[in-house]
């Protein structure tokens, strides 16, 4: 399934009445189809970028033909063209797979299968690696895997009297055929479309899985989860991927690099490795919003032989990002199966913003269906889907509840698993359900972290990373942050560390009832032109943090 940045720009029209757009409000009960038996980017511009290093940096880069700066209208038209073409590609792949029923095409798992096949087919670097590995395996007498093919598990609809259920089927495609079909449909190499899909998968992983193991491996507290957005993004997502990565994700990349450099002192003498390391640190510096944070990164950049001291500095930096949030872009990314429905939905705007009204209206019009795994609750699954589409894993649950009119639950209270169905769970006669949670109100997405004002917090996740630009208090567990502030600041950069700790303490001493995004309001989903601003109601009985107590599957344990 799948998941740019022009805040506040909402031009264009949608040929849908307000009533049609609102038709699936959150509170409505949707039918469940029951089964018979439920069983490091590059900053350099290259003339011919490869699929491994797509260098689009934001919504402004989508469909760019020349270096001339595009107007907001041109950007939105090129984005609209991209999502429509992605939908066309999906339809072609489904025809090739022999899955033509509407229910099959609405299935989120089928959209994911097509997306994964496309990413595998266009990953020339991985294909080359598989080719070399095959050559070695043949020499060693092992079974050869055809590196020219890729495949996925699709779900075919089966009708049994009055019951509808789904059965898994494995379908393979030639990589070259998939690549040719994609490039022909997109009219170009379509790097922006690939990046869009990668971001969607990353946002889904952020919602469905915890990353405690990955955090612990680099010495970071699992409570820093809200800074770990985009941690499963592949490097080939380029600058677009860096924009949506959290500060903690980049800190972890830098710490891993330092760990390798400590084990192999010759590593940073290699010009490619040194350049990659410097890029990670420069990206991290650009993420930082406070001068004290940037100064700490400069200390690490200036270190000739990075080691333990630099890891300590970066750990402190990650902790400070809980209080003074870095710049993280937010985008609405929908499964390409929804983009395939744009012509049928009467969505004739010919302009589309992934951070504004159009994406949210399209989300409300769509009727996506998901396979239900054993024990899944349909409404809980709908919450996972909503949060995946909007990249809202670390958003305040009270804000999401206000926008949808549905009380959102923390991950530990949800009775459902992720959208990927492991091989051992793929059986005949699987049930499915419509994803029923819809927006009653909308607000533009944000790429800023709000401000450093604190509030009450929990015991697992200890801060929020805002996605919607609406005025509200920012949830932060001050007690947990204060525990992290008690650390030794002696050493080569005591002044820099001291300044950063002082900034954090000053921030923590502020009143807890201050708000972020002052003056920003939400709007009814029918109010495209933002004529009637509505104050967001914050319901105190709903917890702030989705990962307050981490009970989700760990991404590292995922069995593909």
Curated annotation (Swiss-Prot):
One of its GO terms (cellular component) is host cell. Late in virus-infected cells, may be cleaved from a 56-kDa protein to a 53-kDa protein by a cellular caspase. This cleavage might be a marker for the onset of apoptosis in infected cells or have a specific function in virus host interaction. It is found in: Virion; Host nucleus. The keyword Lyase does not apply. Its main location: virion. Keywords: Capsid protein, Helical capsid protein, Host nucleus, Host-virus interaction, Ribonucleoprotein, RNA-binding, Viral nucleoprotein, Viral penetration into host nucleus, Virion, Virus entry into host cell. InterPro entries: Flu_NP. The keyword Transcription regulation does not apply. This is Nucleoprotein. It comes from Influenza B virus (strain B/Singapore/222/1979). The gene is NP.
